[in-house]
């Protein structure tokens, strides 16, 4: 006697027992086999020892050595009356006895299974009627209708091949479909109802969502189309809220800044015209006002810590807005900035094209028109603030920035806001994207880095000359 590994498997009723090499495993165990047992009695003896004697009537034995293909008994030896000891005793540790059995079913169970299959088929077709409408081959459509009706008519090989080909095409189209396909709501029956629900409650509760879902799925449109899931209607509300936030109006801080810019623009344009033509009228000295309007705690001296302070202040929304007062010319002359500033402005403006002078709109001195234009500029600056790179005009904007940098390399956040509004209200920015405070801050930061590089280069040259 010697041990042998035994695997018992069952084959489906629609499969052929003689053609199958594997099935559904029932047990995997070891059996002690007597050496005198013949090969043709091995399957019956082992099944009786394992308690599956009822399966021996429709059972078939296979011998598998290691991982090789299982072989039936008649392919191993021609003499089926030979003993197991002579055949497998020396290699019993490498041999597996695989027993395939086909369960015996009576006519009643077969009839019940066929009825269940027909019910499942009808339910699937009724659930998705588009399957039959998309069939182009009339022969395949007739065969499917015959099967659904429960007709026992036998099909020939041509009809079976046509049906199998259509099923393969259907599975291929399903595989190609995107797994994240978006459920399309009907624009005539469903979208108006969804919009109405969204206006009443943009963020409904789970109970409301389920109520909306049941109403949509019970509509006549969804009787012949796929039903909507809970996740799909949640995604619609999420996307609707996101789109409404994107189209939200400009906040009050930006509007207030735009109104302040409307007050600043007339004085700034008037100052430019009077500095060019020497008109003896009341004017507004912008540079002098920048020196007067400072924030407590800010620093005008160049220090490394200011970069972090100004970077943080750009991201903070401040409610305090600066005020501008127009003084008579005698008072301004007494506290005016250096004469080099006016000369530099005249030179920068004279070097530009005549379009700058023509672009200075004298009619903008009206308070109403200035406020309207500033509001439009503020709206456009909101959408253009996301630009990653912005070029300053080398003829009209860079000279002004250079002059501001000479006055204060580390401007406060209030000064940066004033600089931004002044640049955006120039004629050049009417046809180009508006500038943000971040752009001005980055320009000053890069300009300070450039000065530092120049100083380091000059020191290196001086050191080289000293050593030479």
UniProtKB/Swiss-Prot annotation:
An individual GO BP term:
regulation of transcription by RNA polymerase II
Question: How is the polypeptide modified once translated?
Answer: Sumoylated at Lys-327; sumoylation is required for cytosolic localization. May be desumoylated by ulp-4.
Q: Which GO terms describe its cellular component?
A: chromatin; cytosol; nucleus; transcription regulator complex
Give the phenotype of cells or organisms lacking this gene: RNAi-mediated knockdown inhibits expression of hsp-60 when adults are exposed to conditions causing mitochondrial unfolded protein stress. Causes abnormal mitochondrial morphology. Drastically reduces the protein level of hda-1, possibly via ubiquitin-mediated degradation. Under conditions of mitochondrial stress, partially suppresses nuclear accumulation of lin-40 and lin-53.
InterPro entries recorded: HD, Homeodomain-like_sf, SATB1/SATB2, SATB_ULD_sf, ULD
Q: Is Transferase found in the keyword set? A: no
Q: Which UniProt keywords apply?
A: Cytoplasm, DNA-binding, Homeobox, Nucleus, Repeat, Ubl conjugation
> Main localisation, per the record?
nucleus
* Functional description taken from the UniProt entry: Transcription factor. Acts during mitochondrial stress by activating the mitochondrial unfolded protein response (mtUPR). Required during mitochondrial stress for the activation of genes involved in the mtUPR, in concert with histone deacetylase hda-1. In response to the citrate-induced mtUPR, positively regulates transcription of transcription factor nhr-80, thereby leading to modulation of lipid metabolism. May play a role in modulating the decline in protein homeostasis associated with normal aging. Required for embryonic development and maintenance of mitochondrial morphology.
Tell me how this protein assembles. Interacts with ubiquitin-like protein ubl-5; the interaction occurs in a mitochondrial stress-dependent manner. Interacts with lin-40; probably associates with a NuRD (Nucleosome Remodeling and Deacetylase) complex via lin-40. Interacts with histone deacetylase hda-1.
Q: What is this protein called?
A: Homeobox protein dve-1
């Amino acid at each position: 006697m010697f041990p042998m590994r035994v695997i018992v498997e069952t084959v489906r009723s629609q499969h052929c027992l003689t053609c199958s090499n594997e099935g559904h495993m029932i047990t995997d165990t070891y059996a002690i086999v007597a050496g005198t047992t013949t090969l043709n009695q091995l399957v019956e003896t082992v099944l009786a020892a394992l308690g599956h004697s009822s399966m021996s009537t429709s059972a078939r034995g296979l011998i598998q050595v290691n991982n090789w293909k299982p072989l039936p008994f008649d392919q191993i030896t021609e003499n089926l009356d030979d003993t197991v000891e002579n055949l497998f005793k020396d290699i019993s540790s490498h041999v597996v006895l695989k027993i395939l059995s086909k369960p015996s079913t009576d006519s009643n169970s077969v009839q019940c299974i066929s009825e269940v299959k027909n019910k499942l088929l009808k339910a699937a077709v009724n659930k998705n009627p588009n399957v039959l409408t998309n069939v182009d081959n009339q022969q395949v459509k007739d065969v499917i209708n015959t099967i659904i009706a429960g007709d026992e008519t036998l099909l020939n090989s041509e009809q079976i091949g046509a049906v199998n080909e259509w099923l393969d095409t259907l599975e291929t189209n399903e595989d190609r479909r995107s797994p994240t396909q978006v459920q399309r709501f009907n624009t005539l029956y469903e979208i108006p109802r969804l919009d109405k629900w969204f206006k009443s409650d943009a963020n409904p509760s789970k109970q409301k969502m389920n109520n909306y879902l049941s109403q949509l799925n019970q509509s006549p449109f969804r009787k012949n189309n796929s039903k909507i899931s809970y996740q799909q209607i949640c995604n619609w509300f999420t996307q609707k809220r996101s789109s409404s936030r994107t189209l939200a109006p400009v906040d009050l801080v930006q509007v207030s800044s735009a109104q302040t810019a409307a007050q600043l623009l007339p004085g700034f344009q008037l100052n430019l015209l009077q500095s060019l033509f020497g008109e003896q009228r009341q004017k507004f000295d912008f540079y002098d006002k920048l020196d007067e309007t400072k924030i407590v705690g800010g620093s005008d001296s160049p220090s490394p810590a200011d970069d972090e302070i100004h970077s943080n202040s750009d991201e903070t929304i401040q409610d305090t807005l600066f005020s501008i007062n127009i003084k008579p010319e005698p008072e301004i002359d007494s506290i005016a900035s250096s004469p080099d500033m006016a000369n530099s402005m005249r030179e920068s403006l004279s070097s530009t094209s005549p379009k700058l002078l023509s672009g200075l709109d004298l009619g903008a001195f009206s308070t109403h028109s200035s406020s309207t234009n500033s509001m439009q500029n503020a709206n456009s600056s909101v959408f253009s603030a996301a630009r990653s790179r912005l070029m300053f005009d080398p003829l009209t904007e860079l000279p002004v920035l250079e002059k501001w940098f000479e006055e204060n390399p580390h401007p406060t956040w209030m000064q940066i806001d004033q600089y931004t509004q002044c640049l955006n209200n120039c004629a050049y920015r009417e046809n180009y994207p508006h500038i943000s405070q971040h752009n001005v801050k980055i320009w000053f930061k890069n300009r300070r880095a450039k000065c530092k590089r120049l100083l380091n280069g000059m020191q290196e040259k001086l050191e080289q000359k000293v050593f030479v």
